[in-house]
Amino acid sequence: LIDHLRSTNEKIYINEDKNCDVAVIWSVLWQGRMQPNKEVWEKFRGTGRPVVVLEVGGLRRNSSFKMGINGINREADFANQTYDDKRWPLFNHQFRPWNQTGNVIVICGQHHNSHQWRENPSLKSYFKNCIEEIRRYTDKPIVIRPHPRNIVHNFPEHKYKHVRVNLPKRDWNTYDDTDFKKILSSTWAVVNHSSNPAMEAVINGIPVFVSEKSLCHDVGNTDLSDILHPAMPARQNWANQLAYTEWFTEEFREGTPWARIRARLEERYIKK
């Protein structure tokens, strides 16, 4: 992205704010090397200036990357109001028919230091609340699946009937994928607040229960009272628009995603 911006003579500053119109940061996970980005986020958003967020993609992890305005997932504006069916095939995904492959309900955690989690309780409380809500409607077995880099220790799984914790295992044939696909081979539904596991489940034909912040909201369910009869809507139009949330490295270099984002910034976010 920086290479492209320089090639088009955009005025850019690295790690300094010279009264800039927009900030660009990597991720809204306020941890480690990304912790300083929180100050940038708060400074720009607090003064009404937009923040473009880059992060790892969910369609082709570490090959494609998301780029959105003022957030991630469904909270972001991806400048994808216009889209077609030409981009989705680039990600080489084939939808599996909607088909519950088993009887297990999988609850996927997220990282508690992410901006996406700011309005939620602790992960232990989240898992507990989900279990108790699901148990109002079914005694199907439940698997708790923590985020691979945010393991929840000492969760009292034995306190509940037919509940177990399944820790993600690294797939060493990939950069940092896990064995989530294996879990999907025996799954009734996936419960996930707003992160990528829901997307993987939908593509593989497993119904999902998500929040309004999830990119799978339009093809998912939001009320666990429907756990025994989840909706399984058409997915192609959703996928066509989703494909315009992620871009490949060469496209960043060519400026394709920036052209969309820049136009949207000027249209809606940058004060003139």
Predicted regions and their residues:
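Well-ordered, non-membrane alpha-helical segments in soluble/globular domains
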Residues: 1, 33-39, 121-133
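N-terminal pre-catalytic "stem/leader" segment of glycosyltransferase-like enzymes
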Residues: 1-27, 114, 268-272
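Catalytic core of nucleotide-activated saccharide and alditol-phosphate transferases
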Residues: 17-18, 22-118, 240
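Active-site regions of enzymes building and remodeling cell-envelope glycoconjugates
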Residues: 20-25, 48-51, 66-71, 155-177, ...
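Generic beta-sheet signal
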Residues: 26, 54-56, 145, 168, ...
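Leloir-type glycosyltransferase catalytic cores
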Residues: 65-102, 218-272
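Catalytic donor nucleotide-activated moiety binding site of glycosyltransferases and closely related
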Residues: 128-174
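A donor-sugar binding/catalytic signature common to diverse glycosyltransferases
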Residues: 176-222
